[in-house]
């Protein structure tokens, strides 16, 4: 994200002072504790969930006004780090636009699967969407998500779900480096989002749809010209339970395998 030999301060306040003027801000979005809706767009002004009726805010008692309830902090919050300003910033660093064309200019084509660019899925996208595939700078993104306990113990009283984006245009040496792995969203609460994770993904999906359907105007510091940047979600990376949450495909029962589906063979364990 920063030019070579530049580092950020270890103090959070100093980092915010440096990043926010670049447009690299985050959005703090209120959410229903029951994972029904995000309080944005048409729900931005509501004080209770339109689906379950649960209050948007925690209630607190003001000691100066008897027992009158006052709106406290939000009952649940998620953090969204908009991806479009970060992609624009990526193209402002001279070497990065060149690196993003590696899959065309630097990849070895010998029918061996060394990189996602060698896969049949990558080739299928190029053949199906000719205009998109003709521009090597267009982004192919991977989305990864996983729940974790931020306190490092076995307690299930709090979980955090992070949503990461990887850029597969880059070479294997670069695409898994921390610099190019973008934290786009953090969902933190006592309850896991489970199958309602799609509610929280809405801001990210809106940006991805814009990048796919219309594109955004970006200045390429390497070629020193502006162009229309587009992107596609190439794949998702997750464990099997999270696969069900993201795709809606049931991973339980006889047809749990998403590859075999009804053609899967199975053996009942003797003592199961």
PLM feature spans:
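Domain-level cores of phosphate- or acyl-group-handling catalytic modules
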Residues: 9-272
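Amphipathic alpha-helical blocks
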Residues: 1-10
């Amino acid at each position: 994200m920063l030019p070579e030999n530049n580092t950020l301060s270890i103090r959070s306040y100093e980092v915010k002072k440096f990043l926010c003027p670049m447009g690299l801000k985050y959005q703090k979005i209120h959410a229903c504790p029951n994972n029904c809706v995000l309080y944005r767009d048409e729900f931005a002004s509501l004080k209770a969930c339109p689906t379950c009726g649960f209050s948007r805010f925690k209630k607190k008692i003001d000691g100066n006004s008897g027992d009158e309830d006052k709106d406290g902090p939000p009952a649940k919050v998620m953090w969204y780090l908009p991806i479009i300003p970060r992609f624009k910033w990526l193209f402002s660093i001279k070497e990065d636009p060149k690196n993003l064309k590696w899959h065309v200019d630097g990849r070895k084509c010998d029918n061996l699967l060394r990189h996602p660019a060698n896969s049949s899925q990558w080739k299928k996208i190029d053949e199906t969407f000719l205009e998109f595939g003709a521009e090597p700078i267009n982004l192919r993104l991977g989305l990864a998500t996983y729940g974790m306990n931020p306190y490092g113990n076995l307690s299930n009283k709090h979980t955090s779900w992070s949503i990461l984006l990887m850029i597969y245009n880059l070479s294997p040496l670069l695409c898994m480096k921390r610099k190019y792995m973008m934290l786009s969203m953090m969902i933190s609460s006592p309850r896991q989002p489970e199958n309602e994770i799609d509610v929280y993904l809405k801001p990210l999906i809106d940006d991805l749809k814009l990048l796919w359907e219309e594109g955004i105007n970006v200045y390429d510091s390497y070629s020193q010209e502006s162009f229309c940047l587009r992107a596609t979600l190439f794949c998702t990376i997750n464990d099997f339970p999270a696969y069900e949450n993201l795709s809606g495909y049931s991973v339980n029962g006889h047809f749990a395998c998403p590859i075999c589906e009804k053609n899967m063979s199975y053996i009942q364990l003797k003592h199961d």
